[in-house]
C-alpha cells in the first residue's frame, strides 16, 4: 500500500494558476458553496524580486473564500504560476540556516521510514535550489523539479537530475527506469489549481511501497 504522508494538508491557503481569474467552485471538491471570508484588495506579489528598480511588480486581488462543503480555505482568485514562480522568484532554501536544519532532519526521518536501498528513486517536487536533495547520498537516483532551476542550476549537485519546469508526470517519464520510493512536495501543494489531478499524477509515478511526503502550513496555527 502506498504511504502518503500529509502535514497540515487540506486546511491551507491555495494560490493558483491564471492571473487574477476569480474561481466559482472549490479547487478540492468542486462545490459552488463558497463563502467570502475577507478581501484585502489589490496586492503586489511578495515573492517577485526586481531585475531593476523601475520594473513593474505584478499584482492581483487578495481575497479568501471558505468552502462550506469540504471546509477548504482558499484564495478567491487564481494567479499565473509562471509569473509567481518564474525567473523573478527570489526565495532560496539555502539562505536560511533553520530551514536547512529542518530539511536535513526531514531527510533522516524519511530515510528511516522508507528503508532505502541503493539506486532507489527520490523525487523532490518544487526542489528550489536543491538543498533538500543534497542531504541524500549519491547512491540514490535523485530528481529535482522546479521552474526556477535554470537560474539556480549552479547550486545543484552534479548527480541530481534537474527538470526546469512545473511537475507533470510526462516530464519525468523519460528519466524513470522504475517508480519513485520517495516523492516530496514541501511548501508547494497549496499552489495547485487542481490538487486532485496532481495527486493522481504523483500516485502514478510512486512505487506500491513508496512514500509521498507533503508539508504545508496549518491555517489555525498561522492565525
Where are the regions a protein language model picked out?
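N-terminal juxtadomain amphipathic helix
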Residues: 21-97
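Conserved class I S-adenosyl-L-methionine
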Residues: 118-128
Amino acid at each position: 500500500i502506498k504511504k502518503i504522508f500529509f502535514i497540515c494538508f487540506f486546511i491551507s491557503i491555495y494560490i493558483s494558476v491564471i492571473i487574477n481569474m476569480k474561481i466559482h467552485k472549490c479547487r478540492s471538491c468542486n462545490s459552488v458553496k463558497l463563502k467570502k471570508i475577507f478581501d484585502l484588495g489589490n496586492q503586489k506579489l511578495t515573492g517577485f524580486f526586481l531585475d531593476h528598480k523601475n520594473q513593474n511588480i505584478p499584482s492581483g486581488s487578495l481575497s479568501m473564500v471558505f468552502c462550506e462543503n469540504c471546509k477548504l480555505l482558499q484564495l478567491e482568485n487564481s494567479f499565473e504560476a509562471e509569473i509567481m514562480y518564474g525567473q523573478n522568484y527570489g526565495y532560496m532554501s539555502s539562505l536560511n540556516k533553520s530551514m536547512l536544519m529542518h530539511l536535513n532532519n526531514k531527510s533522516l526521518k524519511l530515510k528511516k521510514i522508507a528503508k532505502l536501498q541503493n539506486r532507489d528513486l527520490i523525487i523532490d517536487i518544487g526542489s528550489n535550489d536543491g538543498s533538500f536533495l543534497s542531504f541524500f547520498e549519491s547512491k540514490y537516483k535523485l530528481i529535482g523539479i522546479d521552474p526556477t532551476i535554470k537560474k539556480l542550476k549552479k547550486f545543484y549537485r552534479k548527480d541530481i537530475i534537474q527538470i526546469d519546469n512545473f511537475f507533470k508526470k510526462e516530464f519525468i517519464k523519460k528519466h524513470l527506469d522504475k517508480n519513485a520510493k520517495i516523492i516530496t512536495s514541501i511548501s508547494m501543494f497549496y499552489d495547485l489549481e487542481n490538487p486532485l489531478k496532481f495527486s493522481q499524477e504523483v500516485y502514478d509515478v510512486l512505487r506500491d511501497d513508496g512514500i509521498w511526503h507533503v508539508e504545508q502550513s496549518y491555517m489555525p496555527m498561522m492565525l
